């Protein structure tokens, strides 16, 4: 949905669910991890937290915020000497669940939930700080932004289907629908 067609309540709900909830969860559980100097904090962001997607403004903003929160938390833990508490942020592409029903994934296939779970488990086991799923998307996004002028990046995203991926989006149907 266009930013200009999104209600204030809908935007607030997306931010509360996707971003604010991370603050409350971290505040609740991480102090005990700091005390033990042990634990893993895993936050789920999205590739939309690395690359803006047309008609997904609120969602992208909420997922970019998660990336920033986790980087900031990691810095705070480092400064406090809690080096045994590991932070990981997972940025998956579209996952084949009802949440993204109708989405057009472009040239990439939808991810299976198991692929994302495996990436999370790998992050916990090996202390990965930033994980994209599929793994190569992080490099693709960063290299495009580093090497190409922004209008060319936007054209690439258009050709790859990223900018039009939400045009056919319907989302999960609720019982009321």
Give the label of every model feature segment.
Residues 2-3, 7-12:
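Substrate-binding pocket helix/loop in short-chain dehydrogenase/reductase
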Residues 28-37:
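A short helix-coil junction within the Rossmann-fold of NAD(P)-dependent oxidoreductases
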Residues 89, 105-142:
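C-terminal helical subdomain
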Residues 52-60, 103:
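Active-site loop-to-helix junction immediately N-terminal to the catalytic Tyr of the SDR YXXXK motif
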Residues 46:
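Residue(s) in the substrate-gating loop at a strand-loop-helix junction
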Residues 51, 72-85:
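Active-site-adjacent segment of SDR/Rossmann-fold oxidoreductases
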Residues 26, 62:
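Active-site helix of classical SDR
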């Amino acid at each position: 949905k266009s930013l200009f067609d999104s209600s204030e309540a809908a935007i607030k709900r997306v931010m509360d669910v996707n971003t604010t909830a991370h603050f409350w969860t971290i505040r609740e559980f991480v102090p005990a991890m700091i005390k033990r100097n042990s634990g893993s904090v895993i936050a789920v962001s999205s590739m939309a937290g690395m690359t803006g997607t047309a008609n997904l403004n609120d969602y992208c903003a909420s997922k970019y915020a998660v990336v920033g929160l986790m980087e900031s938390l990691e810095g705070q833990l480092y400064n406090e000497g809690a080096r045994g508490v590991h932070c990981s942020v997972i940025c998956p592409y579209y996952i084949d669940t009802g949440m993204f029903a109708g989405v057009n994934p472009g040239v990439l296939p939808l991810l299976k939930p198991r692929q994302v779970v495996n990436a999370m488990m790998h992050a916990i086991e090996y202390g990965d700080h930033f994980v994209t799923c599929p793994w190569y998307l992080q490099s693709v996004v960063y290299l495009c932004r580093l090497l190409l002028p922004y209008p060319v990046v936007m054209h690439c995203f258009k050709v790859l289907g990223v900018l039009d991926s939400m045009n056919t989006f319907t989302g999960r149907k609720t019982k009321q629908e």
